């Protein structure tokens, strides 16, 4: 089956499944308790019936991959359309599907040994082992955490993200499957942007948004299915480059036009959110994109010119940079009226200073999984206007898990960019260039824009993105050893 036909079949199944589930859940949206649980049981019963019926017409592997693709698509819906609150934990559609996929995976491991062969064939075992070590370290960190409950909730999110990465990397080991995952991201982004434009034009938001029944002056911010506009903007800062690379590397003129329109839509919505960090991420990604497409001679010139430009900027604006740094991070804290909110830059600087204080106080080991928010709420040294999230992904990792885990994550991130870039230099065909260009630029953009959301740990698209990147590196490495099977 060709890649195009397989993608069309998968996306058709995906659209039908999501549409059916949304219709079913929409019918009982206003009910709670018994009716909500009955609806879940009905969905599961229908799902089991369809799985049983499907096994008669397809192979188990294709069936499992269909579950994986639907799972990937449902991660983009977050908890916007359906959620079961179990007190300390909530079940969303993608969490139910992740549990189902996990059970099917374990059942398959018991039945045959193909999973061992899959594992031996992986070219990214070290990266997966780092994520496993991260989770184990998080468990150990509960020994000194102030709040074990908060730590367990955080580790549950971390475990789901890591297990999702493992599933995708284990089963997406062919270029055909990788392109389907890429296509799912592109299609689901269109769906989320439609909701975003609806928010922006009508000033109506989904119940999962903080702007639902929020202040009138914020109603024009698009949030789509996300908690707030910053989360949505960070997501779009990734999708923007996927559309740009699609426009560049696909020869079909209609698809090029669609890619251009969708990239402009994503850029407009980022402007509409007012997220400065996401705009900086876009600029950083564009700068890197221009660099990687330059000829080798011009690349060297670009590096020297960039270094000279940065040095000149630092010299010309050294006093202003230092004074601003002093004002935000070194100057003694000044009192302000509790009736007035802190300026956003001062509040964010205080969040970083608090996190740094907690990190030093823990001797570099971190305050324990998820506990930086607990510390900000109960032990903040600097005023944050009662904000209890760091608003910086790398600093969040540093404060929660310590220096070693943060440097490990950053090293893995940089290593993935480097490997993708080295593959890009090998003059790949358009399909692989689309993947490498899109992922490199999106990774740079996300690294910058990740200072915008309050926390990245609960943004599941981050784990989908990391799974896509790691799976791409694995596929490209395997294609170097066994080129034919990877591109069938």
Swiss-Prot record:
GO BP terms: cell wall organization; teichuronic acid biosynthetic process
UniProt lineage: Bacteria, Bacillati, Bacillota, Bacilli, Bacillales
Domain of life of the organism encoding this protein: Bacteria
Misc. remarks from the entry: The nature of the anionic polymer present in the cell wall of B.subtilis depends on phosphate availability. Under phosphate-replete growth conditions teichoic acids are present, whereas under phosphate-depleted conditions, at least part of the wall teichoic acid is replaced with teichuronic acid, a non-phosphate containing anionic polymer. The synthesis of teichuronic acid is accompanied by degradation of teichoic acid and reutilization of liberated phosphate for other cellular processes such as nucleic acid synthesis.
Record keywords: Cell membrane, Cell wall biogenesis/degradation, Membrane, Stress response, Transmembrane, Transmembrane helix
Induction of expression: By phosphate starvation, via the PhoP/PhoR two-component regulatory system.
Transmembrane segments: 7-29, 35-57, 64-86, 91-110, 122-144, 154-173, 180-202, 222-244, 257-274, 279-298, 303-322, 354-376, 397-419, 459-476
UniProt signal peptide: none
Pfam families: Wzy_C
Annotated source species: Bacillus subtilis (strain 168)
Membrane topology: Multi-pass membrane protein
InterPro entries reported in the protein's UniProt record: O-antigen_ligase-rel_domated, WaaL-like
Record bears the keyword Magnesium: no
Location of the protein in the cell: Cell membrane
Protein name, entry field: Teichuronic acid biosynthesis protein TuaE
UniProt key word tRNA processing: no
Protein's job: Might be involved in the polymerization of teichuronic acid repeating units after their translocation to the outer surface of the membrane.
Gene Ontology CC: plasma membrane
SS bond list: none
Pathway assigned to this chain's UniProt record: Cell wall biogenesis; teichuronic acid biosynthesis
